[in-house]
Amino acid sequence: MKEPIQKYFQVGTIQWMTHPPVSYPVCDSVRTICCDPYFGALEITHIPDSEARERVKKMLDQSHLWVCYGAQPNLLGKGLNPNHLEETERRKAEEELTRAVDEAAYMGPGVSLFWQENGNLIPGNRHIPSF
């Protein structure tokens, strides 16, 4: 193949996997990815610090990247399952997913939302409309 892979694919990375927050400040890692022409897509997840979240939002607004929001860390980290047999447990997962949708919507109108359950990616994505 003589052409760059970007001719055929939109190469992306999962920010919180390739740049774990324990080792890399979230704003620094997002800036690095935004400035790298190799990437055309980026998956982010919950950013607990509101100041950092605002800085990341501004960077993503100015970037060339297609952005996805991964809700799986929000669920898996707390042991939540939207298909749990107990209604109270399903409600907890639903509340967490609702918070994830709200944060994804805040991060920008073009952000897509993904979540993963039991190791299987749920087909498709949920496009977050602009509010």
What do these predicted regions represent?
Residues 2-3, 83-131:
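Active-site acidic/histidine proton-transfer and metal-coordination neighborhood
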Residues 2-8, 27-37, 49-74, 101-108:
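Acidic (Asp/Glu)-rich catalytic clusters
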Residues 8-26, 80-94, 128-131:
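Active-site mouth loops of central-metabolism enzymes
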Residues 13, 42-44, 114:
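Conserved beta-strand positions
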Residues 16-20, 69-74, 117-118:
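Short glycine-enriched loops at secondary-structure junctions
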Residues 18-24, 43-55, 120-123:
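Acidic-and-aromatic substrate-binding clefts and catalytic sites of carbohydrate-active enzymes
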Residues 37-42, 77-86:
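Glycine-/proline-rich flexible loop or hinge segments
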Residues 42-44, 70-73, 95-99:
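Short, surface-exposed, polar/charged, turn-prone segments marking secondary-structure boundaries
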